[in-house]
């Protein structure tokens, strides 16, 4: 009986060592940048999807960022300020080794005059790995 238990424990140890070779991921930060056809944007709403999302933060002090974690795979972010094309905010993600597994969509845009943009087809979001300090 004791030999059977020891054998099963040994087998469990071997099976545990044979896990996924990709590991558990490398948590970190991705920078979310805006591509905009306009120069007078005042607010943008963005949805970011991917695994292991936890939070968002502004990049720099010239914008205000509000976010809501919908699930572990979706975060909704609203950014206010005198927005220009380029980095807007960062998101903490489950695996920065694969930024291509994360995506973002612009869902609404307002001009600095507070008027909603009717056409947001020229807007896009780009996610890149944050530079190490």
What are these regions (language model features)?
Residues 1-18:
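Sec-dependent bacterial lipoprotein signal peptides
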């Amino acid at each position: 009986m004791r030999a059977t238990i020891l054998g099963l424990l040994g087998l469990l140890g071997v099976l545990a060592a044979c896990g996924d070779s990709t590991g558990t991921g490398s948590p970190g930060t991705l920078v979310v940048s805006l591509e905009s056809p306009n120069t007078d944007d005042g607010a943008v709403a963005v949805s970011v999807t991917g695994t292991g999302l936890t939070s968002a933060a502004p990049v720099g002090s010239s914008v205000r960022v509000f976010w809501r974690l919908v699930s572990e795979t979706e975060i909704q972010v609203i950014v206010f300020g005198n927005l220009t094309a380029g980095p807007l905010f960062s998101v903490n993600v489950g695996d920065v080794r694969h930024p291509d597994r994360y995506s973002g969509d612009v869902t609404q845009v307002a001009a600095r005059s507070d008027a909603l943009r009717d056409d947001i087809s020229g807007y896009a979001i780009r996610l890149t790995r944050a530079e190490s300090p």
